[in-house]
Amino acid sequence: MDKKKAAAQSRAGKVEKTRLKIVEAAAACFIAKGFHQSSMRDIATLAGVSLGNLYNHFENKAELINGLAELEAQENAVLLRLLEDTGSPTSTFHTFIERYFTMVRAPDNAALTAEIFSEAMRNDAIYQIFDENRQSLIQALNGLLIAGQKAGDFKSDPLIPSLTPLILDLIEASALRIALAGGEGAKAEGKLLQSVIDLWVKA
């Protein structure tokens, strides 16, 4: 490999690592202090970078929100790959519900989700950023439900795929409630969640 090319790749890797460190620090600050109470200096200090270095990567907290959305997209990529497995629609569907419920109810994820939801209600640009990730999940889950209908696993009702946003809403609301309760009752809640959603869609 050309030395200049190798050096450029090394620099790019360092930049990406620094950006990730800053975004993770921003997430920690938002969870601990809230979006508005967290300053760029707070984030720089937690990330272990100078304030000037932080501004080299992100001009403001809105850009940091974009970084958080990118991290969420990376987490969701695992779920999207799962939903592509239409060989056994019911099994894939149940696995998705379990994994998404577990992911959302994780204490840090739940706290950050609540903070972002609060800010998104006041800032449409932030809402749009995270809605893109949600729409990707909706489309992938729609595809699984349609595959399940063709396989006879799910009800043939043409309205079934339109339930996808409601399914995500139910999982998220249930997960956040469990997170608020400190995780108590998570196992029972997960089973109940599966049963309720099965009533909606299973043939």
Region roles according to the model:
Residues 127-131, 135, 149-196:
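Hydrophobic/aromatic-rich alpha-helical bundle segments in the mid-to-C-terminal region
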Residues 23, 66, 94, 138-146, ...:
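An amphipathic alpha-helix signature
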Residues 14, 18-27, 43, 68-72, ...:
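Generic hydrophobic, amphipathic alpha-helix propensity
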Residues 67, 81-110, 160-167, 190:
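Hydrophobic alpha-helical connector segments
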Residues 1-17:
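N-terminal intrinsically disordered/low-complexity leader segments
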Residues 83, 98-104, 112-122, 195-200:
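Helix-loop "lid/cap" segments that line or gate small-molecule binding pockets
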Residues 21, 25-63, 67:
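Helix-turn-helix
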Residues 92, 105-127, 176-180:
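Amphipathic alpha-helical segments used for helix-helix packing
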